[in-house]
Amino acid sequence: MTVAMLAVAFKISGSSIGMWSIMLPGNAGTPFWGIPRSLRSDEFSVGTLFQLSQSHNGYAPISEILRGDLTDVRMVYGASCWSIITLFRPVLWGYLLFGFEFGLAFAWSAKLCLMVLVSFDCAFLIIKSKPLSLLFSCLLCFSPLIQWWGTGEVILYGQALVLLLDRALFTRKRNIRIIAMVAIAWLCGCYIMLMYPAWMVPFFFIFALMGVFRIIEYCQTLKSNDQHSVLAWSLSDTFVLVFCLLISAGLIFLSFFQSSEAMTSVMNTVYPGARFETGGSGLPELFSYAIPLFYAFDSPLVSNECEIATILCFFPLGTLASLLCFIKRRDWQLIVLTALQLFFLVFAFIGFPSFLSRITLMYNVPVLRLLFPIGYLELLLFLISVEKAKESQGKYSSIGYLPIILIIGLILSSAFQIFMLLSAKYLVARMLYLLMLMLFCLFSCLSFCS
């Protein structure tokens, strides 16, 4: 948190607002550190300018600056304003408390620092290894996908919910449990107010499973001889949690009611209002997790780095390794997470019938947006499998060959991405190369799961 405080104090952010010093004539000044990206026009010329306009509007919920007419900025535009909805958007609090410049630094720096900490703690609950949890946190939070999109609230709030649920369950103090339940209700509102179902829906499945894992472990603890180490769940705890959730739901309903006209207009649009996805278009970008690491320096092969930015997840190594580890160890948590991964992959590569897409809410998810949740889950599965293999084989085993395997995998992944971009019309050749990559991953899994 010291890093975040220093970044705010020195007004350091990841915004590309420095592009305006290039575009506006006679305007001097260059960024102190980093390169402004013209590709991030939706950030520096839309989102950030919304926040800047609000600083000249007294942070009122109705803007007289945007569009040159009265505009409700609470719900659709997601701008900072003195409104109930801002209670569920903590990233915007810096603008209201410190002004635009410090608020911009707060929105970038505090979010990233918290994301690193929360990702580490959440991964440790599942992986049970501090070094691997730290690796997970770094690979996730500093991935091309997070850095290019400048987002990540969905994993920040979702993982924080899992941690707070764990804290509420595995505690011996009633006041700690009450505080955790209040925070859970608030974070549920934060998650809903992200207003981006393309990521909210698949990540909901992931974090819901993690929450179920914690509940099952808590029940097992109560039944064991170690039951006195935790506080038993009581009926009063249920009432407190339901009461907090009802308050949060009431505030959310009030926020929607205040912006009902704007929401109705959005829902009546072709996009995103009439979106209905059934999947099946394929997701070859999953195999190109290596080369996006270098798009920050040069990207001559693509026109939009953001759309194919991924997480360094070693796909499909995690899925294959988890299946092999399950065969050997019968770890039910591992197989449940793998089943969810296969659920996403079936939607991406095969597709769902319309009724199944509607029932599962996956109709809100374009296939390309599955890069984020699939990459997240793949990285988690991979590191869980590594930890399971290390436990079964000992510290000095064939797991030592893993760095070499990963380096070769990264080279193959980069070659596949370049080959795919340069030879789009050679479908058969691409499929053969893809098969070679998958066979390599299978061989890699066998080398440390056998």
PLM regions and their residue ranges:
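Aromatic-rich transmembrane-lumenal/periplasmic boundary elements in polytopic membrane proteins
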Residues: 2-73, 233-291
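Active-site lumenal/periplasmic loops and adjacent helix-entry segments of GT-C-fold
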Residues: 16-156, 299
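Membrane-helix boundary/interfacial segments in multi-pass membrane proteins
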Residues: 102, 106, 144-152, 342-399, ...
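Membrane-embedded helix bundles of polyisoprenyl
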Residues: 113-125, 129-219, 233-257, 407-414
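Transmembrane alpha-helical segments
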Residues: 115-123, 158-169, 208-213, 319-322, ...
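Membrane-interface junctions at the ends of membrane-embedded or membrane-associated helices
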Residues: 168-180, 214-229, 356, 382-405, ...
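Periplasmic/ER-lumenal interhelical loops and adjacent helix-loop junctions
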Residues: 250-333, 368
